[in-house]
Amino acid sequence: MQSATVDETRRRTVQGVALSFLGYVVYALSDASVRELHGALPPFEVVFFGSLLGLLAVPFVRGKGDRWADLLRCHDRRMWTIRGAAAAVGAVCSVVAFTQLPMAEAFALLFLLPGFVTILSVIFLKEPVGWRRWSAVVVGFIGVLIVLRPGFHVLKLGHFAALTGGFAGAVTVVLLRHLGNSEKPISLYGAGLLGPLAVGLALSLPHFVVPNTVHDAIFIVSYGLMGAAGNILMMVSGRMAPASIVAPTQYSQMLWGIALGYGLFGDRLDWVMILGAIIIIGAGLFTFAREKVKQPHATTLRPPVHPQ
């Protein structure tokens, strides 16, 4: 009987990890849709439409007894609002980054997120961090310098947007760790969805651009639907497999980003950028591994790299 239970747990874990990989494929397709828009629509407007279509995922996210109103209900309104604001900043910055940068370069900078999480966890959660994780943070920043090559590489708004997006994502992760035991998952999801929706709508209205081609309409819808589908896959994955096991699969998103950037947009990769990306990924994976060692029974929240 115990053996059957263990086998069932393993089967669900494998299925959960597989769904997670699929989720990051879908997220990468959502990001590629932004790139395909080529800046035809303002970033705030893209975020608004993406969040609006993201509402389609809510029925799949709702737990037993959850209501639509629970998207707005919370115990700590101030932290809930900050969570929504961080999600909005991350969404807008990721759209700017994927519009202006090669996909692999944008992902490399966004994936500095685990380093930011370590720093914020020490400051706000008073989490003890040893020299190994601090070393990973330093190595991650070295990887960023290699990717950016200041003085040898023309820096764009997209580079700063990607770094800001990674920082905003780290704020979200730290807030989820802080609020995870006191708020319903649907409430936390609501903040991450309604924040970008409200900010995107408010800031896009003064210069609203109606998609005037079928191409633009298709890819703005693709951005939102793929984001919603990715959210659903990740929620189901999280219910089937421990988050600490699923978390490292997020780095597969960079591989898909490289493939899509090269195959669809003709992005060119040089060895310096690849080296920097490998260093950043290695630092992030090491951080996850150390968190699992220090807190083997804790839930490691997956960084929400995707804007939704």
Language model segments and positions:
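Membrane-interface interhelical linkers
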Residues: M1-L22, L55-I82, L194-S222, I232-P242, ...
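C-terminal-most transmembrane helix of multi-pass membrane proteins
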Residues: Q2, L255-Q308
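Hydrophobic alpha-helical transmembrane segments of multi-pass membrane transport proteins
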Residues: V25-L29, S33, T81-V96, T164-L175, ...
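Transmembrane alpha-helical segments that form core, pore/gating elements
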Residues: A28, A32-R35, G39, P43-F44, ...
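Structural signature of hydrophobic alpha-helical transmembrane segments
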Residues: P42-G54, V96-L113, L155-A168, T213-G227, ...
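Helix-helix packing/entry segments at the starts of transmembrane helices
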Residues: F107-L112, L179, E183-L194, N231-Y262
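C-terminal transmembrane-helix exit sites in multi-pass transporters
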Residues: P114-S135, L255-I274
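Hydrophobic transmembrane alpha-helices of multi-pass small-molecule transport proteins
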Residues: R132-L148, G169, V272-E291
